[in-house]
Structure formats: C-alpha cells, structure tokens
Regions:
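Core catalytic region of metal-dependent phosphoesterases/phosphodiesterases
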Residues: 9-21, 25-134
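Short, flexible loop/turn elements at secondary-structure junctions
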Residues: 26-29, 144-146, 163-165, 219
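Short glycine- and acidic-rich boundary segments immediately preceding or forming the N-terminal edge
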Residues: 1-10
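Beta-strand-turn-beta hairpins that frame and shape the catalytic cleft
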Residues: 11-23, 139-159, 210-213
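Conserved beta-sheet core of the metallophosphoesterase superfamily
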Residues: 158, 162-252, 257
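Charge-rich, low-complexity terminal tails
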Residues: 103-114, 244-260
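Residues that act as N-cap/strand-start positions at coil-to-secondary-structure junctions
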Residues: 134-136, 237
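Short, surface-exposed basic-aromatic patches at helix termini and helix-loop junctions that form
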Residues: 92-93, 114-128, 151-153, 174-178, ...
Length: 260
C-alpha cells in the first residue's frame, strides 16, 4: 500500500546545481473532451528539455467520469482503462524529473469512494514510482546545490502539495503547516500566485521574524466548455507558474509564463 502522508518525501538534488525549477502539474483531465493536448505537450517538452526541471503532480490527471459525477461519461474521449494507460505513460516519460504525486477529487470522490480503488496509485506503481505517491498531501524536503555558508550542506526547501485547498484573503490551507517555504494546489482551474507570510516567534532566540511562503495554483489543461460553461463560470487564464529554488543561499522566485 502507499506510504502515509506524514512521511515526507526527501530529495537531494545535485550539489553542483545553482538552482532548480519546480513545475506543478494538475488538472489535465485526460479523457475529457475539453483536454488541451497541445498545451500539455508543450509543457511536457519544456520540462524534459529543462536540465534543472523537476515536476510535482497534484491531482486530476484524468477525467474518470462515473455515473452521478458532474462529468459526462458519454463525451469522454477515452475509457477509464485508456485514461490510466495515458497517465502511466506520462509518468514513465517524466520519471527522472518527478518528485511527488498526489491524486485529486476525480479519484477520491469517484473510483476510491465507489469501489475502494486508487487509480493514480496504480499508475505510479506501474511507472515504478510508488514511493513518490501520497494519497492526500505530500510534504517535501528538497535539497539543492551547496550552501555558501556551509560547504558541507545543501540549501533545503520545505513544501506542501495537495489538490484541494482554501485560499481566502485572511485564511488559507498554506497557513496550516509551520515551516514550509512553498505550497502548491489546484482544483479550481484558476491560475494564480498569492504569496503569503506569517510571523514566527523564535523562542530559542527570543526574536520575532517574518516568514514568506510562495503559494501557487497553476490552473488547468482544459479548454472552455462543459459543465463549467453550463454553470456560468468564466473562462480561466492559460497562465502557468514555475518556482525557482536557489542552491547557494535560501531564495525563491516564482515566474509566470504562457505555452501558446
């Protein structure tokens, strides 16, 4: 069975790297008639060609429509087995770049709830990445480069990813966990970067300081239409985000880009 969410995923990237690029992939919805294959292939090619690129998968990679779900089973472009085959192949193609995998509601509220199965975990196992899967939340400890202050240590970044999250003005799921440097989520198909901060009382040194947190949602790979259009939702931006973490000193940069 999959490892518990409380077990962090620890990754030590090469000590000679001066930085690493983190890409957040979620809401592909492969199998939906709205899946934007062109957008996905452009991002996939970018990740593969990026020597310093790493990817974190954050749920809803396939549509997985079932009776009673919002999705229309009769307009799917691939059946559930074919959807799993597609996602498994993406995992295989990006195995060396992948740091973590978590599912979304199109797994947990559908196949898992109705049949007790975990289709995205199956994909991870078939791709030889079962140890990178967490069922709701993945906590990350990523080391990169060589610290300027201590040549025997890497610079470490601590992150949290999960598919669904709250992101209100004065309250967010990113506030739940002390010590994280970045938080990434999806589900709402609304790309945005909403950096947060919190005050930290350093009890050991009796000082108070501010800690910054990068808070990122990379939208979706869906074209406009379907039940979103029927419900009167507005079209969402195609913007994507990449987080750069640096290796000599602790520093992060979030950059936005378009793939069209």
């Amino acid at each position: 069975m999959f490892l518990p969410d409380w077990q962090p995923i620890t990754v030590d990237l090469p000590t000679e790297w001066e930085f690493a690029h983190l890409y957040f992939v979620h809401d592909l919805h492969y199998g939906s008639e709205l899946f934007d294959a062109r957008k996905w292939m452009r991002l996939k090619d970018r990740i593969i060609s990026d020597k310093y690129g790493k990817v974190l998968f954050i749920g809803d990679l396939f549509e997985n429509a079932i009776p009673g779900s919002k999705s229309n089973m009769f307009t799917q472009t691939a059946n559930p087995a074919e959807q799993k085959e597609f996602v498994t192949q993406q995992f295989i193609d990006l195995k060396e770049q992948t740091i973590a995998i978590v599912p979304g509601n199109h797994c947990s509220n559908r196949t898992t709830k109705t049949a007790g199965l975990y289709p995205l975990y199956d994909c991870a196992l078939l791709a030889g990445m079962g140890e990178k899967y967490r069922n709701i939340i993945a906590f990350l400890n990523i080391g990169v480069g060589t610290s300027k202050k201590n040549k025997s240590k890497q610079v470490h970044y601590f992150g949290q990813i999960q598919h669904k999250a709250k992101d209100c003005k004065n309250y967010g799921t990113s506030d739940f966990t002390d010590g994280i440097d970045f938080f990434a989520f999806g589900h709402d198909h609304n790309p945005k970067e909403t950096p947060r901060s919190k005050l930290v009382f350093d009890k050991q040194n009796n000082v108070i300081y501010k800690r910054n947190i990068e808070n990122i949602d990379c939208g979706s790979f869906c074209q406009f239409g379907g039940y979103g259009a029927e419900a009167g939702y507005r079209p969402q931006s195609d913007k994507m985000y990449m987080l750069t973490i640096f290796g000599e000193e602790k520093r992060m940069e979030t950059s936005g880009f378009y793939l069209s």
